[in-house]
């Protein structure tokens, strides 16, 4: 088990969140996940005068700490700082009958690893992500046993393109594959956490 404390500050277009997490000290060191001491996040959505064009910005800083980091008996990466960002633009076209939202973002990962070979202490990665989310909304009134109902049909088409980038040089602190389900069809990353960006060239219906 773990405990965490957080602080959030929000305005119309921007929010900042900080978290501090520690782990139950009764767990054996070999089984401990990394502590986040701390985790800082900032996210923004910035409309423009050319509505519905919008700019998006997401950023995060985490210091990962593990009591067994660097031990020769464990396959645990050293303690590290991780910074990641996602700066993007999207055309958020929405009407009562449907939506069309193409978007592009540039995603960046940077690590500063304490210990290890000098040429591997600052791995980084940059990946472009492009997607188009579109959908239609159809409503139909019908009667059943003297009661009026509305039947709704919402077909959706989603395209995602993320080029392949070799990421074996990046450490793994908190990342795993998402379990496959309906929601996964419309996500832009098949991984949880912030250490991996999955490549894709797919259409979801």
Predicted segments with their positions:
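Outer-membrane beta-barrel proteins and related beta-barrel translocases across Gram-negative bacteria
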Residues: 1-205
């Amino acid at each position: 088990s773990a405990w965490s404390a957080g602080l959030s500050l929000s305005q119309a277009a921007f929010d900042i969140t900080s978290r501090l997490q520690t782990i139950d000290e009764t767990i054996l060191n070999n089984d401990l996940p990394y502590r986040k001491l701390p985790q800082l996040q900032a996210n923004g959505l910035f409309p423009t005068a050319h509505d519905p064009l919008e700019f998006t910005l997401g950023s995060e800083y985490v210091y990962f700490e593990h009591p067994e980091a660097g031990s020769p008996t464990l396959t645990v990466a050293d303690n590290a700082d991780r910074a990641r960002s996602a700066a993007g633009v999207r055309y958020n076209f929405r009407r009562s009958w449907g939506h069309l939202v193409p978007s592009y973002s540039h995603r960046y990962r940077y690590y500063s690893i304490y210990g290890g070979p000098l040429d591997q202490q600052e791995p980084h990665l940059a990946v472009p992500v492009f997607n188009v989310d579109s959908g239609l909304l159809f409503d139909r009134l019908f009667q059943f046993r003297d009661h009026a109902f509305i039947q709704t049909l919402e077909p959706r088409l989603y395209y995602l393109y993320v080029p392949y980038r070799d990421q074996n040089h990046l450490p793994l602190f908190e990342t795993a594959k998402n379990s496959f389900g309906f929601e996964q069809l419309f996500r832009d990353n098949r991984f949880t956490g912030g250490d991996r960006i999955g490549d894709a060239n797919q259409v979801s219906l």
